[in-house]
Design a protein with these regions (language model features):
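Bacterial Sec-dependent N-terminal signal peptides
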Residues: 1-31
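A "functional boundary" signal
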Residues: 20-197
Length: 197
């Protein structure tokens, strides 16, 4: 009986600590978003970075990547490219570790990281590195087999081409995007709904 009380207290303490850590990470992210809305970018960046670290510690990969990408975007906004690239490298390493640990791929998380890296290369006017990231983004979107990511990729691809003066290729990407929207509108379920009515 006496041995079970300390064990029970230890388990209870661990559960309370874990709950507190989760709530703390969520609170940091909420505060970061509020500061971002107020255009307090430095404070928002700091809070996103703290939330990223908290979520990474908890192995909450989706939230960690979300916060990491937001913090990176704020570094990039202030021309702190070294810090932004380093944070994205760390986020990518976190995702790779999570994939190995869970034996599951996270193409949607890789997509977010690659897209932010692409935006930074576009801002730096580095077409070669931007094209490499665009190719990685395409591979990731295909691996995800997700319509939303596929549409996001086509829009990003068009933006890339227009930014670097390749207007005909940008037009082609937009046409593909429009075709995907048209196909989505005329899916078999939608056609059956039209026939029924």
């Amino acid at each position: 009986m006496k041995k079970s009380i300390p064990i029970l207290l230890a388990v209870l303490l661990c559960l309370c600590t874990q709950t507190f850590a989760q709530n703390r990470a969520d609170e940091l992210m909420k505060q970061a978003q509020e500061n971002l809305a107020k255009k307090e970018y430095i404070k928002a960046r700091y809070l996103f970075l703290q939330a990223y670290n908290a979520f990474a510690t908890q192995e909450n990969y989706a939230q960690a990547v979300k916060c990491g990408v937001n913090a990176s975007a704020l570094y990039h906004r202030e021309n702190y490219y070294k810090e932004a690239f380093e944070l994205l490298r760390n986020a990518e390493l976190l995702v790779r570790t999570g994939e190995q640990k869970l034996k599951k791929d996270f193409p949607d998380l890789r997509f977010r990281i690659n897209k932010e890296r692409l935006q930074m290369y576009i801002s730096l006017r580095n077409p070669t590195r931007a094209k490499e990231q665009l190719n990685r983004l395409e591979e990731t979107a295909k691996a995800a087999q997700n319509d939303s990511l596929s549409n996001d990729f086509l829009y990003t691809q068009a933006s890339y081409y227009y930014t670097f003066g390749m207007n005909s290729q940008g037009d082609t990407a937009f046409k593909k995007l429009i075709e995907q929207y048209k196909q989505k509108r005329t899916t078999p379920k939608r056609m059956n709904a039209i026939k029924i009515s």
